[in-house]
Every structure is written in C-alpha cells, then in structure tokens.
C-alpha cells in the first residue's frame, strides 16, 4: 500500500518507520528543511510513561486562578479571540473531575508503557543512539500537600503495574546525588525507575535515516496545502501545483492538524506553548544524572551527555511563538535552585514549541470516518514518550493487524457524537 505521512516530527517519522517495516511504500512530506525542526526540536527530553498524566486534573481550575497572579506560574492563558479556544478550554474543564482524570490517565499510561516497550525493541534491533539514559525519572515535591497528593497517582501506577519508589528528602540523593545539597528545600519525591531520557531531535533525525534505508522517501521544503477528495475518500494531497496521490494518508501535523482537517474531520487539538533552555554542563557533581521533575513549577530537568535541558510550562495563547524572557527566568530559577552550579545558564539556548494538546490529554491515533484517512496527533507534552507505540499501533491498524494494546478509545471516534458523524463532535 502506498502511504503518505504528513509531518516529520517524532510522531510522523515513527509512523513512517513502522509503516515501512510493515511493508508499505511510504512518503513523508514536510514544509521544513528536515525532520524534528518544530515541536520535536528541543523538548524536555524525558520518556516518562508513569508520569503520563492529563493537564485536566482535579483542582486545576482553582490552581489556574491562583497561577494568574504568580510570576513563575506553570500555566498562563491569553484569549486569542477564537471560538475554538473557548470550546477547547470548556471541554478541558469538563475533564477535570476525578472520574475523568482516572480514565484519561489510564489511557495515557497504557499507550506510554507500550511505547517504551516499542522503543526498547527498536533500540535492541537497530542500535540507534540519541544520548539516551535508562536511570529512571524523579518527581520532587516542595510542599507536604504535594507529597500527600502523590497518593492519587500512585493508585493509578499500581493499577497499571508500574514500578515506583516514594522517597523521603534524605533518600532523594540515592537517585540524584546532587540533590543532597538542597534536600532541605524538598518534602520528598516519587521515582519511576523504568522511565528513560534522551534527545528527541537526535532520535528523530537518526530514525529518519533508518527509515530511508527501508525505502521511505522524505520530501522536505514542500508546502502541504489541502487534501483532495474523490467521493468519500482522499485522492491526494495538494502540494503547491502538485497533487501527491496515495492509497492512504496519515496526518501527523501536530498543532496544525486541526486547521488542516477543517471541514473534513473536526478534532480538538490545540497548541499548548512550552519553553526550554539547553545549558552546557560545567560541574558534573552538581548536575543531574537523569530527569528531575519539579512539581511546583511543572518543569523537567534532563541530563544529556554534556548538556542540561530544562523544559516545561504551558501557555494557552494560540500560535504565538514569541520567546518571553520571563519564561527563561523561570527555567533558570528552577534549575539553579535544584542543581546550583551544574550548568551555565548564561550560555543556554532558549526555545519555544507548540505541543498539540487534546482536552482529555489522550492523543488521537487511528482511523477516521474517512476510509483512507488516519490520524496520529494530539500527544501534547508526551509526543516523545508515546511516539514509538503510536507509530507501531497505527501501522498495525493500517495493516489490518490486531494492535498489541486496546486502541479503540484512542481514535477520533471518542469525540464524535456517533460513528461516522464527522461534523458532530461531542465537544462542540
């Protein structure tokens, strides 16, 4: 089967790789000059199935009000004047109940755990290198309330059989030695020893090269204008004056998927803006050894070979990609507070990206009401974590194989008023 994949971020490239492995003839099209040059370029770097959680959670609405008045708040909202933004935020609020949170987190952990298994198999088979580490991840708490609140997440972890360790302040240094110097600031931590880290952009670039060896064709610097219909099916994708034809099409355009599919399939994927800095390591003993997540600032601090990546925060501000100095100051504050002297933040590079977020936090992977149109988008802050599993799952669905995990609640049909009701989404 001839397949066109639209988008060459980590989700698009993994889709192409697994489709090619399944025997399909794959072409990837992207407007950028190479793979992983947008949202996948400088993300936080962690592969964290156990921390796969929706932003829509109990207590978040009240926290959001408080964050409006805080300088270093992890969430910011600026109305962009669109009805879609208001609809998306309303649907997100509806998912902030305990029952919806449990369902959504369960879905996310299921896919994320499977994705890590797929990544490990891929690594064993290909030997792909991306400055990866398998030292687990550590969430640190600054208040007793945060520490006590971890019980809800632990219940979900136990249900999913995810190994974990709840650590006291004195035990944190066992996982991250440099935290010994600042343990008095912390009330404890939740460690997931099965989590991993790595450079997403490096991984995507090298996987694209492996995909090319399997016969995948990459067309960069190519405009992606619209899908052309023939009856109830996609005939091709319009790229400037050219119509690129195929048997099936995969939309993996991240935050741009919603507008691209407008009038065809309505999906609730909204850009959630995030930031990162990448600083050179200047003192090994004061630097992290894996990933540390600061629960207060919602920031992840990740160790690469000779760099520290600090990323996080969320802004609901539309497609604004301006770099706000105040956000850089928050990232620097967090890493310098937990790992003083570990990295030189004065020499850090500053970046922003738009994560494609659904209101329930779960990505959209699989079939659509259009017979030969498939989606792999909406992974939010977990595109790197979920990429391999999403790509393998999609390849199985498109190849007529039974996926290794439950997949029906991951497709766009969970938003539709009825199967086939492409213009009657439940969130509208």
Swiss-Prot record:
Xref: InterPro entries: DadA, FAD-dep_OxRdtase, FAD/NAD-bd_sf
GO molecular function, one term: D-amino-acid dehydrogenase activity
This protein's record includes keyword Cytoplasm: no
Superkingdom as given in the UniProt entry: Bacteria
Keyword Chloroplast (UniProt): no
Catalyzed reaction equations: a D-alpha-amino acid + A + H2O = a 2-oxocarboxylate + AH2 + NH4(+)
GO CC terms of this entry: cytoplasm; plasma membrane
Residues the entry annotates as binding FAD: 3-17
Protein's pathway: Amino-acid degradation; D-alanine degradation; NH(3) and pyruvate from D-alanine: step 1/1
Protein's GO biological process: D-alanine catabolic process
Pfam families: DAO
Family classification: Belongs to the DadA oxidoreductase family.
Record function comment: Oxidative deamination of D-amino acids.
Protein name in the entry: D-amino acid dehydrogenase
Organism the protein comes from: Paraburkholderia phytofirmans (strain DSM 17436 / LMG 22146 / PsJN) (Burkholderia phytofirmans)
Gene: dadA
